[in-house]
Amino acid sequence: MSRAAGWSRREFLAFGWFPFFRPKHISLAGARFNILRNGRSPRRYLLVHGNEETARAVLTRHMETHEGIAYLIESQTRNVPVDTAEIDPNRMFSRAGAEASLNRLNPNLGPPQLESALQALDRGRERLLKALLPTGRGLLIAVPNNSDEYSVADEQPISDAVSLREPGNPHAFFLCTDPADFALIAESAYNVVLQQKKPVEDDGSLSRLAANRGVRYVNLEVRMGNSDRQTEMLRWLDSILP
């Protein structure tokens, strides 16, 4: 009999922190995330949109050499199912944001179906957030990709501070919620915006929630397909921020 098979319930509870007892997945409605762990660092990483394959590859490789916990959505599509509808997974971190996303993506969704989807998200949201959000002064790094439709120019009007060291490359930039992190990044050759204040509109994104809760959060945006640049910026960010 193996040692694990012979353990008592008390031993399982006492030693449940062992790596082979840690969950490998966590879900909220139809958004299921693979969990990659390396070492003991409390740093968190996130890939929230399944169609951003450049970011997926960059983050997966990064976790081979850097400590922390990464959450990578399993879906290969941008949106995920919830009940009988679909939602943008980066709009599900608040009820208001989730409702707006559900209405936009599912124009024929009736009130009972809408409420059912919202309740499904309400039941599991805090459990997911407890896993994603670091404690204390820990850091969460999100690694998305963008296209021609989105750049740092979209964030400038709603940001508290802006540093554009690469105005000719608006698709590569950092978005952060902590002024100290912003100050460090602003000294670099990269574009960065600060969004610390609670926004007037709650769009359900993780950056808005992090700002609201005072969580250190950095979003690393790079154009889809530019893996070398995203790798460079992620390694640099990990080396410069405490």
Each predicted region: which residue ranges?
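Secretory targeting signals
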Residues: 1-7
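Structured catalytic-domain cores with a bias toward divalent-metal coordination
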Residues: 7, 13-242
